[in-house]
Amino acid sequence: MAAVEMGVFDLVGTEGMPEADAASRLGIASRPARGLFDTCVATGLLLREGGTIRSTPAAAKYLASDSEYSLRNYVLDERWCWPAWGRLEEALRSDAPPLPQDDDGYHVFPEEFLLDFLHGHSLAMGELLAETIAFDGVTRVMDVGGGSGAVSIALCRANPSLQAVVVDREEVLVKTREHIERAGLSDRISTRNANVFTDTLPDDCDAAVIASMLHDFSVERAAEILSRVAASLPSGGTLVVMEIAPDDDRGGPVLPAVFTVTMIVNTEGGIAFTRAELKEMIEAAGFEVERDVTLGERYVTTAIEARKR
């Protein structure tokens, strides 16, 4: 995290820089520089050749701030998670997050950080979704709680005739529009300022995507989201839900299991739902589940495709 926060990968890039120059530019002495660079080399983030260090392709793609797929802010998320995780016992005993929440039950992160920190990850997941589930015949998709618009961007890139509308709060959509414009898709992706619990959702879409959102809420609130989305779609409309889902017996994998604890620390009522739980809620909202697939071995993310009755 320190290497990302200090801008090591932005500084050296794939072109490289002598270690001494990099240390000087970073403003750190030779001993801590050696420890930092050695660790980055050992973990596969930097390459060292004759006293010159450079970013590996993976580090350049995911840790440089100017990369479309940058996970830089995702890594820096740890700065804001540490205070909450340090009070884990309190959260477990009280069944409530130890840090302040906003009116919708979200952990209060600095706004400028929150709007960007998942974009690179969501873009990669959206591309996997586009490769896995065909949106043939879909004309307009509603991206519910779409954040930066990354999933809509990925889907529209993969489906040239598809249009999308990102539904989220206006304070989020300010940044969403920047990402859409940067992607050159302003003519195909629009935004809609709406609270999914209280406002009217678009009724001109024949598909909806709910990506990495339901886990922020309790079973009751997640079911309410699904019901409101169902009410806005026509009969036969497509629903795709993406979630980090543990096995049905909750015995693994490790990441989804730990993710539930993350929700306990950071949300009021949030939990990682199993595939069976997701399917049950989706069917109760008025859909027929058609299939579920795992998106990528590393991400342990489930995509469930359903059709409105």
Regions inferred by a protein language model and the residue ranges of each:
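Alpha-helical subdomain
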Residues: 1-42, 47-48, 135, 140, ...
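Conserved Class I S-adenosyl-L-methionine-dependent methyltransferase catalytic core
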Residues: 1-6, 10-11, 16, 25, ...
